[in-house]
């Protein structure tokens, strides 16, 4: 009996100690775009710098793989001068990261516009479902007075032909527990297939702050090799107002606060020693030309979706599947659950890499 009680105590101790794990204090977190040379002589791009415990760190992007890492600044070689920096950037011009950054941060002015009364918005618990009438399937912009609202701007599917799909899971702020059955199903699938399941979690800062234990549980599945998670910035507060039109809603409601909305999420992630990915998903998939231009300055590639399941969109090879893991949109989860074992899920980074790599 004593052995059983001791065993139970050990389990409870480790579970509780993990749940109360505290994030490190991060200061001076800021965006940069600086080519550096790593210890193994590779050229990478520093997109963030910050201080932790009085030590300086970079978040680096590998421009050939989109993989990110956190390194001490003292372990990389910086360009000696402006000319050397420019020469390094020239060498990076043909890399997959720079190509994607340029491709998905440019507004095509030829996109067809449509008026406010040509679509309706349906919101339920922070979830938005759009129903609109467009003559062109490729059109994602709507013009309101002097500003242009963009819907679903960015990469909505793979840049190159692939056999497989990309599962993106939005974690908007929510008062509900996360989709536990769904995430545990992914872990079970990992055990069955004997490999980590690649998923992309588009996370808001408020969700992490309000659901720390669930966030840490996800990290644990990643550490244990069950889930291969790419962490995508989904803004800090994911603002939404039921009584406002799109041009004054989501991040368009306060464009002056855009930098803070973006940087606070990254700051939270690095405090847990997570290297943020070079991707961003606009709340509600709503943006405009101003925010898209700013996004490039942060080194971010915007992610949309051509398979938002709750909207009735169908999955194809190369699709960026969109479901909500925060329990605010059950329809998408109900649809994806029976499909999970049949899908060939790929890491989001592979969507931007030529298939011969």
Swiss-Prot record:
Annotated InterPro entries: Glyco_hydro/deAcase_b/a-brl, RPE3
Record-given protein name: Uncharacterized protein RP012
The organism's place on the tree of life at top rank: Bacteria
GO biological process per UniProt: carbohydrate metabolic process
Record keywords: Signal
Membrane-spanning segments: none
Signal peptide boundaries: 1-19
């Amino acid at each position: 009996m004593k052995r059983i009680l001791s065993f139970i105590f050990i389990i409870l101790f480790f579970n509780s100690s993990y749940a109360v794990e505290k994030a490190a204090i991060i200061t001076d977190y800021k965006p940069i775009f600086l080519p550096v040379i790593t210890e193994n002589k590779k050229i990478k791009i520093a997109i963030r710098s910050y201080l932790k415990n009085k030590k300086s760190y970079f978040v680096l992007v590998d421009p050939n793989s989109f993989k990110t890492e956190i390194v001490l600044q003292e372990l990389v070689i910086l360009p000696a001068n402006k000319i050397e920096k420019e020469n390094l950037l020239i060498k990076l011009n043909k890399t997959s990261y720079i190509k994607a950054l340029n491709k998905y941060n440019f507004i095509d002015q030829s996109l067809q516009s449509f008026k406010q009364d040509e679509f309706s918005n349906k919101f339920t618990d922070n979830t938005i479902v759009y129903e609109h009438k467009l003559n062109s399937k490729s059109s994602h912009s709507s013009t309101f007075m002097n500003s242009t609202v963009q819907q679903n701007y960015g990469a909505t599917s793979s840049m190159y032909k692939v056999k497989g799909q990309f599962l993106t899971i939005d974690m908007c702020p929510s008062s509900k527990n996360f989709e536990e059955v769904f995430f545990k199903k992914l872990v079970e699938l990992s055990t069955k297939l004997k490999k980590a399941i690649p998923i992309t979690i588009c996370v808001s800062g408020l969700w992490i702050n309000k659901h720390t234990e669930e966030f840490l549980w996800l990290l644990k599945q990643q550490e244990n090799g069950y889930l291969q998670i790419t962490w995508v910035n989904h803004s800090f507060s994911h603002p939404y107002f039921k009584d406002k039109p799109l041009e004054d809603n989501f991040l368009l409601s306060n464009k002056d606060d855009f930098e803070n909305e973006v940087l606070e999420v990254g700051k939270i992630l690095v405090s847990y020693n997570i290297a943020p990915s070079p991707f961003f998903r606009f709340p509600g998939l709503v943006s405009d030309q101003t925010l898209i231009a700013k996004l490039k300055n942060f080194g971010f590639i915007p992610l949309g979706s051509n398979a938002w399941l709750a909207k009735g969109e169908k999955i194809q090879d190369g699709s960026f599947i969109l479901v909500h893991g925060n329990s605010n949109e059950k329809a998408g989860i109900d649809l994806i659950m029976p499909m999970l074992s049949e899908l060939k899920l790929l890491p989001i980074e592979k969507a931007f890499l030529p298939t011969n790599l």
